[in-house]
Swiss-Prot record:
Pfam families, per the entry: Ribosomal_S17
Keyword vocabulary terms for this entry: Ribonucleoprotein, Ribosomal protein, RNA-binding, rRNA-binding
GO MF, one annotated term: structural constituent of ribosome
Family that this chain belongs to: Belongs to the universal ribosomal protein uS17 family.
Protein name per UniProt: Small ribosomal subunit protein uS17
Species this chain originates from: Cytophaga hutchinsonii (strain ATCC 33406 / DSM 1761 / CIP 103989 / NBRC 15051 / NCIMB 9469 / D465)
Length: 87
């Protein structure tokens, strides 16, 4: 029998920009994209809503999130770990 790999899901690392919701956080994930014409690398930011079951995150924390089933209208990610707490 084949085993279903749970680790085949996407993982992203980013900073928490909002934790005002109940058991939810907003994570800003930054990536570099090369400009098509000029070749300069541009920083693009994607904001993800993630599920924080224990409400352990604060604004400015660096966190790792993993893709999961839809939990609400906008939440499709869940908190895996807090990499670094904000100072």
């Amino acid at each position: 029998m084949e085993e279903i790999l749970r680790n085949a899901r996407k993982e992203r690392t980013g900073k928490v920009v909002s934790n005002k919701m109940n058991k939810s956080i907003t994570v800003a994930v930054e990536r570099k994209v090369k400009h098509a014409k000029y070749g300069k690398f541009i920083h693009k930011t994607t904001k993800l809503m993630a599920h924080d079951e224990n409400q352990e995150c604060g604004i400015g924390d660096t966190v790792r999130v993993m893709e999961t089933r839809p939990l609400s209208k906008l939440k499709r990610w869940r908190l895996v770990e807090v990499i670094e707490k904000a100072k």
